[in-house]
Amino acid sequence: MIAWALIFLAVAIAAGVLGFGGIIGAQAWIAQVLFILFLVFFLVSLLSGRKPPVT
């Protein structure tokens, strides 16, 4: 999933350089949504404070 987010991020950066339009604009929107989603998941994991299992 992270690989897809990075691919969409690269496409979004290219779209920003060339101008947002068509399918590139849609991919830029998807990249923004994925970024916010992963940021929320990261913050939730930080706040939950779970420790890794001890083996």
From Swiss-Prot:
Its main location: membrane. Pfam families: DUF1328 (PF07043). The keyword Transmembrane helix applies. GO terms for cellular component: plasma membrane. It is a multi-pass membrane protein. Keywords: Cell membrane, Membrane, Transmembrane, Transmembrane helix. The chain crosses the membrane at residues 4-24, 28-48. It comes from the Bacteria. The keyword Membrane applies. It is found in: Cell membrane. Belongs to the UPF0391 family. This is UPF0391 membrane protein Sfum_0248. It comes from Syntrophobacter fumaroxidans (strain DSM 10017 / MPOB).
